[in-house]
Amino acid sequence: MLLLGLDAAGKTTILYHRVLGKVVTTIPSIGFNVETCKVNDSEVTVWDVSSRGKIRPLWRHYYPNTQGIVYVVDSTDRDRMTEAKEFLHDILSEDELNGVPVAIALNKRDLKNCMTKEEMEERLDVSEIQKNRPCRVFLTTVYPTEEIQTELMNLFEWISEEPTDESQESSTKHKNDPFSSYFWTPLMKMKSMMFE
């Protein structure tokens, strides 16, 4: 599973909240974070990949084995909504991701001045995405209150139940080969870029 989105959207915070069950202090990701968490009685490997400029071209190395995408958007960042939309649609236009389910997390719902769900769906052109793949929108925060609920758990449960036939076949193939490029290609490519 890939965890993607613009920088500062809250990707890493969401990842470790899901893994550890609590909020931890994070710093901007330079390369990637990878963790395994239990979802619906299954072990799911989640790759949280930096969206910094030099790293973005490397995302394609993760695509062939992706069974689901979680795309995180900052609900308060009106100035970057066009960028967030373009980024999302560029990712989903890749051939390797045809039919892969995507969960869109409208994050930081605990903050003031959040855009409405309807406004964000329109600005991200969610209806267009839903024509070609399973896609759902979730309201998320790692600081829920009685008034502000979070759908983080529902998000991970939903996307883990929506694998494509192609991704299932690929997952089985690579599971039987622990030294396959599924693990090593992204790691080695990322390392070479980070130290250039």
PLM features per residue range, with description:
Residues 1-165, 194-196:
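TRAFAC-class small GTPase G-domain
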Residues 170-196:
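Long, low-complexity intrinsically disordered regions
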